[in-house]
A protein has these predicted regions:
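Beta1/beta-strand and adjacent pyrophosphate-binding region of the FAD-binding site
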Residues: 5-19, 36
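Dinucleotide-binding Rossmann-like beta1-alpha1 core, especially the glycine-rich loop
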Residues: 52-130, 252-254, 297
Length: 399
């Protein structure tokens, strides 16, 4: 207890979503356990459970590809690391491009291999065996990650949290943080909604879609926009068998199998962005998106003649101007920001936790493949966004 009757900790993490508890887990793995996670609801109750859960390392930004590779290694060893099933299913991942993107696909695959990603180009005939229901005529080349697949972000968050608790880290649910405590240019803790405080040397803000307004109250502009993302579940009407995740960069859609025999559909067309209030948005696909689903899925998978939409849901992405995250020391001493994941957060979450832990403990990344400067907040004000070296026509920011 401090003199004001509040709590104390070396580190406070604001936000008990996936990235917040991944950070707690990573700190615990490094022996730093005087940590309190403050979550206004319950662990993973925000946008974590809305993730489509796709696991792939196919990024044109090398540091992101490396982070995804780290995430994959953790997911593969989940039973050993966490002692529980986190819902990871290793179906494989295929990405298909049209003729305009063949050269950049090959360059991207080569760059991914340089940072340890197991990936290769495969022939159309192989993809036809993997996805016999798909019309592959519009595609000119395909990339393949045998170790890719999909997972369950909510289950993964619970595993991170359980591991952190086992290490001695405190996770306080139903504990809303209203503001930072600041003395001059130094963060000294957080103020809670119940009027109490937690004093701390370091505060990690991992508040996702709520980050911009939270930090704006302290004069810190974090350029994050909130976009509603819609997902549709489809029963294909046929027995699919074991099919991989399929990222279609011709019609800009992605599908993945589901344990119930359904497929999950998402749209990856950046022309379809929709701003949203994360506290008041439509939590299902609208009629326009359902029509889009029927059109895109019907075109790519003509064998789905008896397909039926079974359900839908929506969540919100915290999107930065360059569609890459902010994992950075903030403008106040002792402040670290981990937000703006732009739809990439689940697959890289173990690496996010480790990078934040590095920044807190060492002041820099300990993984040479992942320079912390790539994700610095200041890059936007400097006019130096983080961009893929090998953009795809129509989907550059998403890769």
């Amino acid at each position: 207890m401090n003199a004001r009757g509040g709590d104390t900790a070396s580190i406070v993490i604001v936000g008990g979503g996936l990235e917040g508890v991944a950070t707690a887990w990573a700190l615990g793995q490094r022996g730093v356990t005087d940590v309190v996670v403050c979550e206004r609801d319950t662990v993973g109750a925000g946008m974590t459970g809305k993730s489509s859960g796709i696991v792939r390392c196919h990024y044109g930004v090398s540091s992101l590809a490396a982070m995804a590779a780290t995430g994959l290694e953790v997911f593969e060893k989940a039973e050993e690391i966490f002692g529980t099933d986190i819902g990871f299913r290793q179906t494989g991942y295929v990405v298909g491009v049209g003729s305009a993107n063949v050269d950049n696909l090959r360059k991207s695959l080569a760059a991914q291999r340089e940072v340890g990603v197991q990936t290769e180009e495969i022939d159309r005939s192989v993809v036809a065996e993997l996805w016999p229901a798909a019309d592959l005529d519009p595609f000119a080349a395909f990339g393949w990650e045998e170790r890719g697949g999909y997972g369950d972000a909510y289950q993964t968050a619970q595993a991170f949290a359980a591991s952190a608790r086992a290490a001695g880290i405190r996770i306080r649910q139903s504990t809303a943080v209203t503001e930072l405590l600041v003395d001059g240019e130094k963060v000294t803790g957080v103020q809670l909604a119940d009027g109490s405080t937690i004093s701390a040397d370091t505060v990690v803000v991992a508040t996702g879609v709520w980050t911009r307004p939270f930090l704006a109250a302290h004069g810190i502009d974090v350029p994050i926009e909130v976009h509603r993302e819609q997902i549709v579940m489809i029963h294909p009407g046929i027995e699919l068998g074991a099919v991989p995740v399929f990222s279609d960069l011709v019609s800009l859609q992605y599908v993945r199998p589901d344990v119930r025999g359904e497929i999950l559909f998402g749209n990856s067309d950046l022309a379809e962005l929709e701003g949203a209030d994360p506290d008041n948005y439509l939590n299902r696909a609208d009629e326009r998106f359902l029509d889009l689903t029927v059109d895109k899925v019907g075109t790519r998978f003509p064998a789905f003649t008896d397909a039926a939409i079974t359900s839908s849901y929506a969540g919100c992405y915290d999107v930065t101007p360059d569609w890459n995250p902010i994992i950075s020391a903030g403008p106040l001493d002792g402040l670290v920001i981990a937000a703006g994941f732009s739809g990439h957060g689940f697959k890289i979450s173990p690496a996010v936790g480790r990078l934040v832990a590095d920044i807190v403990i060492d002041g820099h990344s300990t993984d040479p493949r992942v320079p912390e400067t790539d994700f610095r907040l200041s890059r936007f004000a400097e006019g130096d966004p983080l961009s893929t070296r090998f953009p795809y026509v129509g989907a550059g920011e998403m890769r």
